[in-house]
Amino acid sequence: IKPGTKDVFKGLAIYGEGIQNLMNDAPTDIGIQNDFGNTVSPVKGVALPIASFMAYLDHSWNESFSSSVGYSLVQITNSDGQAADAYHKGQYASANLLYYPLPNLMAGAEVIWISRDNYKDGFHSSATKIQVSVRYNFSHTLGKH
């Protein structure tokens, strides 16, 4: 979606069961559901519900500078038989400033924040990092002068 001449919005929302293989962060599609009243099959495999969304805004400041800022979330509804340290929720946010001094050269800096919560063991971890990148695009076709 282009909300303005210098902006591009990218968004996605998804919900499903057993689709974790389609996600980068979510590791398990099927969880153990306890059914202790059933002596023949006291546990069964169930497709785990997952909800996820992401939203990013790309902005062109001028011919030499651009930025992206955004956020994403993935959250699993865990089954009661999963381990306490099973993946439950992950979050990711980033913002950058890119500089294009020449047509084939880009340099930029980005701040990234990540977070993970486990199912039941109370584990929570987050980290913030700064990343610096330089990219030069080049090409040459052999046999052409």
Regions found by a protein language model. Give the residues of each.
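Transmembrane beta-barrel strand/turn architecture of Gram-negative outer membrane proteins
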Residues: 1-4, 95, 108, 131
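Repeated loop/turn-to-beta-strand initiation elements of outer-membrane beta-barrel proteins
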Residues: 7-9, 64-67, 99-109, 140-145
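Hydrophobic, lipid-facing positions within transmembrane beta-strands of outer-membrane proteins
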Residues: 51-55, 91-95, 128-132
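Internal helix-turn-beta structural module
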Residues: 96-98, 102-119, 124-127
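Outer-membrane beta-barrel "beta-signal"
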Residues: 125-145
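Residue-level signature of outer-membrane beta-barrel architecture
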Residues: 1-3, 59, 99, 113, ...
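Detector for outer-membrane/organellar transmembrane beta-barrel domains
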Residues: 1-81, 87
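Transmembrane beta-barrel strands of outer-membrane/channel proteins
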Residues: 11-17, 69-73, 93-95, 109-113, ...
